[in-house]
């Protein structure tokens, strides 16, 4: 799906929910959908302010909350008190491993896990709307640091 199509889908959804489609909100959505890494709300704010210094923190946070509630972005608690987001519209499904020490997020996809989740849902007659798998632990770099080794 093209970025313009993604933005139109989000715009229509927000308008249907009674939100005004302002220049700031359009910029926030464009930046969030155009970011292909895991970002914090403050990182998104900085990216938006680079394009328009008038973008408000409150509008970024409100817009992210609406985007998350609608399923256009997914919020990930990093285990260190932080929260990172990624846009999911137009992306292949994948899962995450989150380092509870440094907050780094690793994406992965495992066909066997997918197969087992589908079988579990089928076994109990459950229709899956969306699913997420987050594995929390300690990454290799932080494990080495804990042992006093160089990363």
Residues of each region from the PLM?
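Basic amphipathic alpha-helical segments that dock to polyanions
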Residues: 60-70
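Pre-recognition alpha-helix immediately N-terminal to the DNA-recognition helix
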Residues: 26-31
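Non-DNA-binding regulatory cores of transcription-related proteins
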Residues: 70-151
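Short, Lys/Arg-enriched N-terminal segment that forms or immediately precedes the first helix
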Residues: 5-18
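A short acidic, leucine-rich amphipathic alpha-helix
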Residues: 43-49
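Short, leucine-enriched amphipathic alpha-helices that occur as contiguous helical runs
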Residues: 7, 24-25
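Short capping segments at the starts of secondary-structure elements
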Residues: 35-40
